[in-house]
């Protein structure tokens, strides 16, 4: 599995520990649903102003958010809905954009560590790449159960 992490902000220091948490969160989420490991995910770490612009451009929502997911293939609850033929070694699942600035604010607000917040946002975003959503209450419950299960498997609880 290839995971690309790029930091495009200077508001919050990003160290190897944060990058490792992002990688572990991706791997632990993917392995719940997919048997193969030949996937690629890109993660972009940004500030609030950058993610606000993306949110406005792609979702028509003119405010900052904590994380955005851009899936390449159509999944529904962890199952691929289309046949794909990829000529490369790695199958690109999509892109994740995390506002580390927003994550730091939320960690403080919720009374837990930045590491726990980053792990949660990463798991949440990968679940979106895999076709989970939280628009309907039943779907939200399923997604929350997976989030908690994966975070607990990583030793990160509320």
UniProtKB/Swiss-Prot annotation:
GO terms for cellular component: cytoplasm. Its main location: cytoplasm. GO terms for biological process: rRNA processing. Keywords: Cytoplasm, Endonuclease, Hydrolase, Metal-binding, Nuclease, Ribosome biogenesis, rRNA processing, Zinc. Its cofactor is Zn(2+). Zn(2+) binds at residues 124, 128, 134. Pfam families: YbeY (PF02130). Its EC number is 3.1.-.-. GO terms for molecular function: metalloendopeptidase activity; RNA endonuclease activity; zinc ion binding. Binds 1 zinc ion. Signal peptide: none annotated. It is found in: Cytoplasm. Belongs to the endoribonuclease YbeY family. NCBIfam families: rRNA maturation RNase YbeY. Single strand-specific metallo-endoribonuclease involved in late-stage 70S ribosome quality control and in maturation of the 3' terminus of the 16S rRNA. PANTHER family: ENDORIBONUCLEASE YBEY, CHLOROPLASTIC. This is Endoribonuclease YbeY.
